[in-house]
């Protein structure tokens, strides 16, 4: 368990106090993949770097388990950092070392015997699919391969927590998907707690269990990804979701003016996503429908669907009751 208790961070610049992170309270459960999303300057990198005290907090407390990280001395901090791995946007690999040498580096710093290092490096390169690249140098690798080396290096000391600082931002979409699949596999197989920061809601949707949304250094929304993604409350969250779904809300509302009837958003979650609920209820209630927008996808392993439909004729109240009885969430957009 990682607990932020009124943790905050400020800087002094030319005699002025700049607040990077306002006091916040947050809990991240053991074994979770927890996402932190925000635009540039929102405070997300500051937040993740407070966990291993690469940034020193200005106040508040940070607990990992029962240990108060904010109270650790230098020796305690070194021990903590061996339990926390970190991967970076631009990989931070040592260009003069081979792939195997980069993965071995934290073990060498820890004084691990050579035989153990060699065995651990071989194990980790197999895990990230780079066995055949052990003797290559970073300059000979693709971006995705470099990030896999970074992941292997971060796992070298068998950490309990893995911090991912914009780990996919420098990668193309296909490589991003493969790296996210690898992180999800590591989470499942090793039970690591993963804290991932990004400015892309699609990354959150694919891999995270819960998410926190930061805006101008403030925590504005948090919750399970299914809830936050499908029913965003804060304006910043709604913008992120619209960008992920490639929906122009203003354009969509202009389209509403061209159609009559009651406009609703229907949200299907789980196996019900694939059931012919809309057609059945239309037949039962005499309601006609016009689909204005639709999407079927997955949030991590959970299928979901969203339709925006215009309903005309028939019994609207009976239709709404039928949707609710079928487990479909109904949001009135225009009555």
UniProtKB/Swiss-Prot annotation:
Keywords: Amino-acid transport, ATP-binding, Cell inner membrane, Cell membrane, Membrane, Nucleotide-binding, Translocase, Transport
Membrane-topology descriptor: Peripheral membrane protein
Cysteines engaged in disulfide bonds, as pairs: none
Chain positions recorded as ATP binding sites: 38-45
Catalytic activity: L-methionine(out) + ATP + H2O = L-methionine(in) + ADP + phosphate + H(+); D-methionine(out) + ATP + H2O = D-methionine(in) + ADP + phosphate + H(+)
Cited Pfam families: ABC_tran, NIL
Keyword DNA damage set for record: no
GO molecular function: ABC-type D-methionine transporter activity; ATP binding; ATP hydrolysis activity
InterPro entries hit by this protein: AAA+_ATPase, ABC_transporter-like_ATP-bd, ABC_transporter-like_CS, ACT-like_dom_sf, MetN_ABC, MetN_ABC_transporter-like, NIL_domain, P-loop_NTPase
Subcellular location per the Swiss-Prot or TrEMBL entry: Cell inner membrane
GO cellular component assignments: plasma membrane
Its EC number(s): 7.4.2.11
Residue ranges of domain ABC transporter in the record: 2-241
Assigned protein family: Belongs to the ABC transporter superfamily. Methionine importer (TC 3.A.1.24) family.
Subunit record text: The complex is composed of two ATP-binding proteins (MetN), two transmembrane proteins (MetI) and a solute-binding protein (MetQ).
Summary of the function given for this chain in its UniProt record: Part of the ABC transporter complex MetNIQ involved in methionine import. Responsible for energy coupling to the transport system.
Protein's recorded name: Methionine import ATP-binding protein MetN
Source organism per UniProt: Xanthomonas axonopodis pv. citri (strain 306)
